[in-house]
From Swiss-Prot:
Attaches a formyl group to the free amino group of methionyl-tRNA(fMet). The formyl group appears to play a dual role in the initiator identity of N-formylmethionyl-tRNA by promoting its recognition by IF2 and preventing the misappropriation of this tRNA by the elongation apparatus. Keywords: Protein biosynthesis, Transferase. Pfam families: Formyl_trans_C, Formyl_trans_N. One of its GO terms (cellular component) is cytosol. The keyword Protein biosynthesis applies. Its EC number is 2.1.2.9. It comes from the Bacteria. It is an enzyme of class 2 (transferase). This is Methionyl-tRNA formyltransferase. CDD domains: FMT_core_Met-tRNA-FMT_N, Met_tRNA_FMT_C. It catalyses: L-methionyl-tRNA(fMet) + (6R)-10-formyltetrahydrofolate = N-formyl-L-methionyl-tRNA(fMet) + (6S)-5,6,7,8-tetrahydrofolate + H(+).
Amino acid sequence: MRVVFWGTPDFAVESLKALIESKHQVVAVVTQPDKPKGRGKKVQPPPVKVLAEKYSIPVFQPEKVKGNKELYQKLKELEPDIFVVVAYGKILPEEIINLPKYKTVNVHASLLPEYRGAAPIHRAIMEGKEKTGVCIMEIVKELDAGDIYQCVEIPITDQDDIVSLHDKLAKEGAKLLLDTLDKIEKGEIKKVPQDHERATYAKPIEKEEGRIDWKRSAREIFNQVRALKVWPKAFSNFRDTQIKILECEIIDERSEGEPGEIVKIMKDEGFVVQTGKGKLLIKKVQFPNSKPISAADAVRGYRIKEGEKLF
């Protein structure tokens, strides 16, 4: 099939790569405009654009899609069979969705109708889910509400964080996408409507969600740290500065001391903090304007002592 691919970040790269290597023909890629990134605010292309250009695939980067007649005309001239959308970053208007022969499908990183919206992977980890998944659905006007072609389930383990789960879902999504496209082309697949009454929404992550409330349970804080490891990172006040908690481990349920209190120093592993329920062994941290370091190095370098508090 002649495919136009819509996607922007790393999550979309796996699906584009799979399509390029498949029997389908990627006739164009639509992605977000290049944006300034990092401390130096250097303008950088989206990861999807980098891959597309490597394979000499035409790339469109419209500032806006709705009402963009020039883009619509260019896409129409490509005579696409289907549009594939993976984390493009903007909602597509109906005239675009309905342009191709087989309309438009989307790779979404949740078990729909759970976690429609922008941050399904983060929310699944933060809310302590034991499983998530990826679905291929038809795009409709309403956000993530289209009929579902196929889904695959993936367990969430305590070893997972936002990075590992993101990568697993991106890979599984790419495989499922190819399988779905083959079945659509052969007419071997039926769409199933979502149960809209069961729909939940994964709103975008806000910076302040990184702030740790030590009165919460060890399990809740552990999930927060894993989910927000890339951005904004879980953080807490310590002494007269802010410290980011990058890795931790639940060690036991007994209580000693106040929430936020450092109750034990484990020289080669880090330091133990009491929470509202249970304790956390802090294993990796980051101080302002510094690189991430092991909590054991932080104990030595910053002379962290029992009885000090994170707040």
